[in-house]
Structure formats: structure tokens, C-alpha cells
Amino acid sequence: MELLKPNRSVLGSGPGPGASLCRSGGPLLNGSGTGNLSCEPPRIRGAGTRELELAIRVTLYAVIFLMSVGGNVLIIVVLGLSRRLRTVTNAFLLSLAVSDLLLAVACMPFTLLPNLMGTFIFGTVVCKAVSYFMGVSVSVSTLSLVAIALERYSAICRPLQARVWQTRSHAARVIVATWMLSGLLMVPYPVYTAVQPAGPRVLQCMHRWPSARVRQTWSVLLLLLLFFVPGVVMAVAYGLISRELYLGLRFDGDSDSESQSRVGSQGGLPGGTGQGPAQANGRCRSETRLAGEDGDGCYVQLPRSRPALEMSALTAPTPGPGSGTRPAQAKLLAKKRVVRMLLVIVVLFFLCWLPVYSANTWRAFDGPGAHRALSGAPISFIHLLTYASACVNPLVYCFMHRRFRQACLDTCTRCCPRPPRARPRPLPDEDPPTPSIASLSRLSYTTISTLGPG
């Protein structure tokens, strides 16, 4: 990926600590295709303003870096240790966490440190490696989001067809193909990346494309393959998912109202063997418990064997005034949470990456104009948006998941177990405690219930 460079107006003028070059930085901050430096004259600012801007920038970088590393490491550990979370969707989430962790580790330090030091000190090998790994991580993140969108669309809208191929082995093959495709797509980065002198004792890691036409073609290609096409696929997939959920919600509400009126008219248990929503209209139906806990699952309701009648079932219950509407309201709340999470996913994807791709495309076709318009605070804000994408994905995909939160608590409890409480020992002249009448009656009831009649 390429981004415009912040100029000296951000942190002050002149090389050294607390200053940045007009086109210096890590692989995200690449120089022009021709290699010519076009620095703007530094704006005169007070020392207090420069120190405040530097402190704010370093603080934001540090917070985003810690959240990205900590959140993605937690996801990898929890998904790797918890057997209950080893599902197809979570396999893609694990790949997404690895790519986001790679983006944070391979990009942020090598972007911030050269800007603070005024030169790139890590050498040509690190320059090429960081540029390549950064591009691969961005590509894997985008393709992982697309894979998750397609997997959820298949699970919710096409459950019968998805059961044939929706396995963990198939997910593993898709993940491997995603990483291999991203690795091949980003080969031009290490080829055309090098460390170039930008002044006396000043080096910078930058791209040197053969011509302006090659650079423009590459920018448009990335804009289509890693932004527009994935964005359209995600928007269509999540739009169809939202439509399916709301249609199923309306059908469930009609079914509950009809069932309630039938029970009220008969004055007893509803009879008959009517078809469920999944059999009536061929759509997928989400159970309240699954939708409330997972938020991404769906199942086809299969006929189950009717349990034996109990004594409480012999008496026909009288339907309450809100017995039919409460399940519908619970499903409404659960499905609204699902749709809300899907909309957040799409909005954050466009929010974090639209400025980056727009700036790169603009710079490829009009470098001087883009540099004059975006240098300074705008490009710094764009940088923070791209880096924030590595820490918002864990929040959106995993911390809105109840089972993941419970797995986090279980993992923390396992890593930091509480010391067992010491039981008080009875005194030598003290009799041992005798079970009370309530304990004996509970024990007798448990024994009788366990043994059963006969």
C-alpha cells in the first residue's frame, strides 16, 4: 500500500528527534514514483505547538498499537484454546486476527520511528520485508472479510446447500488460498521498494516505479481488487442477510399470532402437525437462543421425537395475555443485534479504507495537487484510520460475541487460577457437623429421583 507522506508541517522542520521529512517514513509512507523530492516550505510554529502535536501523535499511535497487538493476540489464544469456538466462522476470524496482528507489528513501528528520527535506519532488507508484509496483511484482511461475508450468507440464507461444503477443512483450504493469493499479489512491492538517500545523512524507504503509467495502473488495480469489488460483495451479502432476517422475523411474528389465536379459540393445547417456517417458505429460521448467543448462526428446524407426557402436561394451560408476543419480541431483539453488527462491519470497512485508496489514486494521477491538499493533519488522520482497522476488527467480530467473552473469562481464569480457600478445621473437643433435616430430605429426594420407580 502507498500513502502520502506527512511533511514537516506536522512535527516541525529539520531532521532529528521530533521532526519528520516531507517524504520519509515506513512502507506506508512511500515516495514518489520518479524519486524526486518535492518538499513544501516548513511552516513556522512554536515549540509548544510542535511538542503538543508530537505528544498527541505518539499517544494515539501507542494506544492503537497496544489495542491491536493485545486484542488480536487475545483472539488467537482464545480461539486456539477453546474447543467450543472451533467453528467455520471462527476459523476465518482467526486468520483475520493474524493478518491484523501482522499489520500492527510490521507496519506501525516502522512508520512512526523513522518519522520521529528523521531517517530510515533499518536497512534495505527490512524495508523490502516490511513493505511486502504490510501489503500481504492488508490483502489478507480484506479477503478474510469477504470470506466471512460469503460464509455467513451461505449459513443464513442457503443453509441446506452450505451444510455440504461448510466444514473446517474447507475453511482451512480457503484460508491457505487467501494467504497464497495475497502473497502473489504483493510481489511488486519488494521488487520496487528500496532505501534512497533524501539528504545529508537522511535515508527513506520508498517505492520506485518504472514509470508513472505503471504506478497509475497499480493504484487502480488495488482500488478495484481490494476495495470496490470486496465492498460491493460485502454490501450485497449483508444486505441479503438483513433482508432474510427481517422476512423471517415477520413470518415468525405472524406464526406466533396465529398460534396464539388458535390456542385461545380451542382453549387447550395446540394440535396438528403444521409446517415450520423453514419448511413453509424454504427460508432459514434462527432460534432465539442461537441468535442471542452467537449472532451469526442459523439452523433448519428438523422434526424431533415428541417427549413423553408429564403430569403437568395433562392439564391444559391457559395462555397468558403475552405468551405469544414474548418469543417474537426476543427474536426481534436478537435479530436486530445481528443486523446492527453486520452494518457496523460494512461501515467500518468503508470508513477505514476509503480515504487510503482515494488518496493513493489521487496521488497516482495528480501527485503535486494531492500533496498540497493532504499533507499535514489530513494524511495523519488517514494513517490513524488505516491502523485503527487492525484494532476495531477484534472489537466488532469477537467482543460482541457472548461465547467469546465467556471464553475470554475462562482463559483468564485458567491462566490465573484462584487459590483454594482453606476450610476451617474443627476444634479437638468439637463434634463433627451433622447433616440437617433439610439436607437429609434433599439427599433422600435425590436418591429416589435418581433410582426411579421400580
Swiss-Prot record:
A lipid is attached at C415 (S-palmitoyl cysteine). Residues 265-275 have a biased composition (Gly residues). Glycans are attached at N7, N30, N36. Disulfide bonds join C127-C205. The keyword Zinc-finger does not apply. Residues 257-284, 422-441 are annotated as: Disordered. Its main location: membrane. Belongs to the G-protein coupled receptor 1 family. This is Gastrin/cholecystokinin type B receptor.
